[in-house]
Curated annotation (Swiss-Prot):
InterPro entries: 23S_rRNA_MeTrfase_RlmD, MeTrfase_TrmA_AS, MeTrfase_TrmA_CS, NA-bd_OB-fold, SAM-dependent_MTases_sf, TRAM_dom, U5_MeTrfase_fam. This is 23S rRNA (uracil(1939)-C(5))-methyltransferase RlmD. [4Fe-4S] cluster binds at C77, C83, C86, C166. Belongs to the class I-like SAM-binding methyltransferase superfamily. RNA M5U methyltransferase family. RlmD subfamily. Gene3D superfamilies: 2.40.50.1070, Nucleic acid-binding proteins, Vaccinia Virus protein VP39. The active site is at C400 (nucleophile). It comes from Legionella pneumophila (strain Paris).
Amino acid sequence: MRKVKPKLNLTSQTARIVNLSHDGRGIARVNGKATFIQGALPGEVVEFQYTRVKKDFDEGKLLSIVEPSTLRVEPKCPHYQMCGGCSLQHMSAEEQIRFKQSHLLDLLSRYGHTEPQSVLSPLTSHHWNYRNKARLSTRFVEKKQSTMVGFRERNNPRFITEINQCPILNSKIDTDIVHLRKLIDTMEDKHCIAQIEVAAGDNEVALIFRNLSPLTEQDELKIREFAQQFQYKVFLQPGGLDSVFCFYPSDAHAYLSYELPDYQITFQFHPNDFTQVNAELNRKMVTQAIQLMELKNSDIVLDLFCGLGNFSLPMAKHCSRVIGVEGNKNMVERAYMNAKSNHITNVDFYAANLDDVMEVRSLVNTSFSKVLIDPPRSGALEIVKQIDSIDPERIVYVSCNPITLARDTDILVNQKGYVLITAGVMDMFPHTAHVESIALFQKG
């Protein structure tokens, strides 16, 4: 029998917000059912309209605030209500941190079935103009005869939010978005550029133009003039990721750089490489991870998901040896390059399938006293399942997804005999619901 789709009640409703969801939406209880409302804060009475009715929950659109929360602030960005780049600008920065810390501890309790012996003070940074990496969509609109440059709309990702500024982006891009739009408006093939990747180092900013067709000579000239006038490195991407090349300056090397001044280390990276988006927070995160490791001169450390050596190289200055393992061969090459340029010799790097600990052990036949894990959002499930084969006394786990951290914590604590000593959040992405966290496990 065909299911009858519930009809939307389009009349406005009033409800009190009782909590926040993991993605920062307000939660109201209407007739005993959870209703998620973007932009609403706990304690507020809001007027809303249903946008989706499901079996277990509903979703609604915020129409007005009847009783505002004392936690509410005026968003700095004029595009905030539509743009999908942020989700928490209406909440004070201090409350954002409290929300993220509470969310982490709740997940560790609910899914990790444990709680840390102590809670780390949150790591924070400047919460404007922090974002050094981003992907901007572009589209030339025939009706308007103008180009849209921006992030996808929050409520309809098929569409682009046309923005003139972005206060979370690197300050140079923040002020130059208008000029980017004007550049594409003047090109002969206005439909050629599908997106623009932004990557900033400490001293340079690179733009990667995804060109769907070969550029005309005139368009190449316009891009060169733009890059020269506004001082950008420009890369073109005519195909897949391996097609990216440095277009301007034509004689320039392809790398940007960032520094960890406390360790006198400079990293070079390609604009396509994975690097942390928030340079200030990254410096604090590396220092906290090393402090939690309590490294000794005799320690041999395993750095899993090591990337270009962001943790490996500074750790190597405090221990006997670091072995870094990474799934991406290009990043392993980059890690070796950075070790060499910084004259760090007590490190080795390997490419391996990090879902197969036995493959890692076959490459690295040594004992490790300590392990650092910095996995992608999917977490480190296979590693923690097989952690016995490594048998470290101490594990520092850097996480970009608190749900998978909680899952892996459950295994480490309740199956493998580790104790969760401490944990806390690191606000890598202010004004978003994204939660970066760090946890320390000690063998029981």
